Amino acid sequence: MYEDGYENITNIDISHTCVKFMEERIKERCKNMKYKYGNVIDMAEYKSGEFNVVIDKGTLDSVLCGDNSEPNAEKMLSEIHRVLAPNGVFICVTYGDDESRKKYFVSFFFLTFF
């Protein structure tokens, strides 16, 4: 995305190791890209409406495989909804089938496309 002209990209990961590795890897060529440690279930450090676009690539799948999966998935999507700007876009890349995932989205997002 950065190489396509998108800037001010914030990447959030729950792994300190991943964040440190990626910060080192991108520091010279992607000056406006940030990697931050965080948990998508509680993104209190981010303001409501802070992001125009949120992309999830497999995080929902991981959350649904863990303990307290259903409540945590709802917390995650609630937080994404909160930090997403009005008319913002949420893109979720998931291996789950449409019907099993749809129930999580209808509570938080007006338009859902599968």
Predicted regions located by residue number:
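Class I SAM-dependent methyltransferase SAM/SAH-binding core
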Residues: 1-43, 78
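A short glycine-rich, Lys/Arg-flanked "PGG" loop and its adjoining helix->strand segment in the class I
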Residues: 69-86
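Class I S-adenosyl-L-methionine
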Residues: 98-114
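A short acidic, Gly/Pro-enriched loop at the edge of an enzyme's catalytic core
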Residues: 41-55
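Conserved beta-strand signature within the Rossmann-like core of class I S-adenosyl-L-methionine
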Residues: 86-94
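Short "lid" loop at the C-terminus of a central beta-strand within the Rossmann-like core
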Residues: 60-61, 95-100
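A short SAM/SAH-binding and catalytic strip from SAM-dependent methyltransferases
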Residues: 52-71
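Conserved SAM-binding loop
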Residues: 11, 52, 92
